[in-house]
């Protein structure tokens, strides 16, 4: 399996950006700020631009596509419930590890001050908002969930949960009306979703240049080896979280289905390799379905129902990533996230992961949503771009392993009912 061209270009841009900045941090600083950093800013803005349309399109389409669950209520209920439970577990694992290891605290106060100065206008606003959030009541997150004006909510990335709430409500309402009346608007959102995915493809074509600009500016504006140390700690924290999710899957497989965990891993290994090489749950779906049906002996009616839904709404690897990355960036900027704010990360990451497109690097766009909702500077994305692509490949392995796990659970329940 080989990297695609975009992957190679992103890695090359990271290396060239680092080398360029290490060679000339002083004389080239003004040049980089004026002529290179803007490309990174454009890339970040394009990610923020597509975040709300992605949530609207993918969630409304995803929920309305579950119409068939009314015919398969038993299988559908088990499938959705299990997927949501594993996603909540994934976010919780990420939050637990990042709060214990604290990778963002590995940088010195000097480096933190330089970062805050570099992104001062954004970070100070976020810090003030975080302090205000600490003084809110226990039910304030529930109040904030329901928008008083959807147009106003959609105009500000800070109100992502309100957009998610409206999108899910809209999709459920489409299911509840006669299909003949729902068809025109469903066709619209199906097409709208395809357009959004194509826009994401176009944005990610620009990714190597954006990553280059962000990395070059980051190293020039905060030139400290602490950043490399903190990135290493962040990467290790995330990889540990992903490894723990694999262990949790194996325990679930053993305890609920009685299967041998080693045999389970051997059966889905080819699908994991494809997932690692493509970074796409959707591209891996045919291989996953083949391995689950022919090597895990899951009935075709179960695998053909559970796995396509999983490729859309089950992004456990992405969920671990959202939690670790969001808190890591907050720690790096010296933001103290309250318990309520971290609960908000669980709900936002869970719901946003459902709306995540099963395409490479969709997690970055979802992370924009989580950061905005939690009041964390989106500019902090520059901190993790350098290592995101290889970690994205690992996240996808966890995503499809979770899909295979849930399919075996649903198969077990179906057999017990029969």
Segments the model singles out, each with a brief description of its role:
Residues 1-17, 22:
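Single conserved hydrophobic/aromatic residue that forms the stacking wall/gate
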Residues 19, 25-28, 32-33, 44-47, ...:
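Signature of multi-pass transmembrane helix bundles
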Residues 28-35, 73, 224-233, 257-269, ...:
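Membrane-water interface of transmembrane alpha-helices in multipass transporters/channels
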Residues 51-55, 207-211, 280-288, 302, ...:
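Transmembrane helix boundary and interhelical junction motifs in multipass membrane proteins
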Residues 64-71, 106, 178-183, 191, ...:
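Juxtamembrane helix-boundary/capping and inter-helix hinge elements in multi-pass membrane proteins
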Residues 71-78, 198, 202, 295-309, ...:
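Membrane-interface alpha-helices at helix entry/exit sites of multi-pass transporters
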Residues 252-310, 329-338:
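Membrane-embedded helical hairpins/re-entrant loop segments and their flanking transmembrane helices
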Residues 323-418:
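Transmembrane alpha-helical segments and their short flanking loops
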């Amino acid at each position: 399996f080989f990297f695609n061209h975009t992957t190679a270009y992103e890695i090359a841009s990271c290396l060239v950006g680092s080398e360029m900045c290490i060679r000339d941090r002083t004389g080239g600083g003004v040049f980089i700020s004026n002529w290179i950093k803007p490309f990174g800013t454009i890339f970040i803005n394009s990610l923020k631009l597509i975040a709300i349309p992605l949530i609207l399109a993918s969630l409304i389409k995803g929920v309305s596509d579950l119409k068939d669950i009314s015919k398969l209520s038993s299988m559908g209920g088990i499938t959705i419930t299990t997927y949501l439970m594993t996603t909540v577990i994934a976010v919780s694992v990420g939050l637990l590890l990042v709060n214990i290891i604290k990778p963002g605290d590995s940088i010195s106060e000097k480096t933190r001050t330089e970062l805050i100065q570099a992104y001062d206008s954004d970070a100070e606003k976020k810090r003030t908002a975080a302090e205000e959030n600490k003084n809110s009541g226990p039910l304030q997150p529930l109040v904030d969930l329901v928008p008083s004006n959807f147009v106003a909510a959609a105009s500000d990335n800070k109100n992502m949960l309100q957009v998610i709430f409206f999108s899910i409500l809209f999709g459920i309402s489409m299911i509840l009306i006669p299909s003949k009346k729902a068809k025109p608007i469903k066709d619209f959102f199906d097409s709208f979703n395809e357009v959004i995915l194509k826009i994401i493809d176009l944005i990610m074509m620009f990714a190597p240049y954006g990553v280059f600009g962000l990395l070059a500016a980051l190293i020039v504006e905060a030139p400290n080896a602490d950043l490399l140390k903190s990135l290493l700690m962040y990467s290790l924290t995330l990889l540990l979280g992903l490894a723990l999710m694999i262990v949790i899957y194996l325990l679930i497989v053993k305890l609920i289905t009685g299967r041998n965990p080693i045999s389970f891993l051997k059966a889905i290994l080819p699908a994991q390799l494809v997932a690692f090489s493509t970074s796409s749950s959707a591209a891996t779906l045919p291989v996953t379905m083949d391995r689950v049906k022919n090597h895990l002996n899951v009935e075709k009616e179960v695998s053909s129902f559970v796995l396509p839904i999983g490729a859309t709404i089950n992004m456990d690897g992405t969920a671990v990533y959202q939690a670790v990355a969001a808190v890591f960036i907050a720690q790096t900027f010296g933001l103290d996230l309250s318990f309520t704010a971290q609960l908000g990360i669980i709900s936002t990451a869970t719901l946003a992961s459902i709306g995540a497109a099963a395409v490479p690097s969709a997690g970055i766009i979802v992370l924009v949503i989580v950061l905005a909702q939690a009041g964390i500077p989106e500019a902090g994305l520059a901190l993790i771009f350098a290592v995101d692509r290889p970690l994205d490949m690992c996240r996808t392995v966890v995503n499809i392993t979770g899909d295979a796990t849930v399919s075996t659970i649903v198969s077990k329940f179906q057999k017990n009912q029969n």
